[in-house]
Amino acid sequence: MPNVNDVTREKWVLGTFPEWGTWLNEEIAETTVKKGTFAMWWLGCTGLWIKTENNTNIAMDYWCGSGKRSHYDDQGKRKMMDPDHQMARMSGARQLQPNLRAVPAVLDPFAVTEIDAVFASHTHTDHIDINLAAAVLSNVKKKTIINGEERDVPFIGSKFATDLWRSWGVPEE
């Protein structure tokens, strides 16, 4: 029987997030795609998971982060928007925009075991994610076959996206 004395913040976080657990991971893994079609799952925000009839799996623009977490910086000072930020330039706003996650995290990146490519259309932080990169590098069993040669899962994106991945430790090849 559960006891309140055993509940900690860490247990709550680990037991609650991602909100869907591995439900969607399991659904994707168990889905057989009919010939001549493909399957697609919305991962929240801008993310998509695409699976083909040949069992090719592509994550596109998957973000599993939380956005901004506080109005304040580490010194307790209220954060303001960088005047060069596109929203500040467009609107003249100076108050920090929240960029909070508005939909649940539906896919557990650390439960991904089969993926053929990670794709980021651009480097806005809701299109590219360090958690998925780390999970793919450490957990994926299936390697991509290119021209009959087994290779690591490719991370595909613009120069800015690939530079960001490299800065996180994703290997060049």
Language-model features: locations:
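Metallo-beta-lactamase
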Residues: N3-K35, K141, N147-E173
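Short hydrophobic/aromatic-rich motifs at helix boundaries and adjacent loops
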Residues: P18-E19, P104-A105, H124
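Pre-active-site segment of Zn-dependent metallo-hydrolases
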Residues: L24-V33, E53-F119, N131-A135, K142
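A short catalytic or substrate-binding loop motif that flags glycine-/basic-rich loops and adjacent residues
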Residues: M40-G44
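Active-site environment of divalent metal-dependent phosphoester hydrolases
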Residues: T46, G65-G67, T123-I128, T162-W165
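Short beta-strand scaffold segments in enzyme catalytic cores
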Residues: G47-T52
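A conserved hydrophobic position in a structured secondary element of the catalytic/binding core
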Residues: M60, I128, G157
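A short acidic, amphipathic alpha-helical/loop segment
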Residues: N131-V136, L164, W168
